[in-house]
Amino acid sequence: MTVKLAPSILDADFGYLADQVEAAAAGGADWIHVDVMDGQFVPNLTLGPMVVRAIRRATTLPLDVHLMLVRPRDWIAPFRDAGADLLTFHLEADLHPHRTLQAIKEAGVGAGLALNPGTPILQAVPLVELLDLLLVMSVNPGLGGQQFIPAALTRLERARAMLQAENRADCELEVDGGVKLDNIADVVHAGATMVVAGSAVYGEGAVEVNLRNLRGAAA
């Protein structure tokens, strides 16, 4: 199985955003990961549907929009209309996640659920039938460039076992936070099928080369 790579534009140069997205596509990215933060659920404030619409114009790659905000259900239609292909929200941010997942599916886009590092994996079990993607955070959400939390490897293994036990091995298992050349093989071995990488792609060096190196290290 070939792991999917989803560069996070949170670490891109926003002055040249279209170029940065195009460079990711040229380097073999499978998805573009877009971090949306509201300054309430997480301390940082990033972007909204207008920027997602601009990214949509810049690429044909599918857009993985990660909603780190309160009241995620209110934002399904705006981000769907802006061009999102998959919407992921945090279990911790929603009192009625089942309704939100149903609303995302009804909107015609993929549905993802994110779990913070301190949230037990088993809390996703009642919702797994509605998921296209389960996101295991390997940092605390809200800021780019954080260090990978090693316990995320065990959590990925538990998540993979849970998906298999629930007959949902087809569900993407994504990891986000601190993934670099020296640990990408570990997260793939632990069960991740989709990897978000920010500073490892948009930090030092050429974006295309960085992505190819990550792909090689993941094999």
Residue spans for each PLM region:
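Non-catalytic terminal and connector segments of soluble metabolic enzymes
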Residues: 18-19, 163-174, 187
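Generic enzyme active-site microenvironment
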Residues: 33, 174-175
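Short acidic loop-to-helix transition motifs that present clustered carboxylates
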Residues: 118-120, 180
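Strongly charged, low-complexity linkers/loops
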Residues: 139, 145-146, 168-170
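Acidic, divalent-metal-coordinating active-site segment for phosphoryl/phosphodiester hydrolysis
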Residues: 178-190
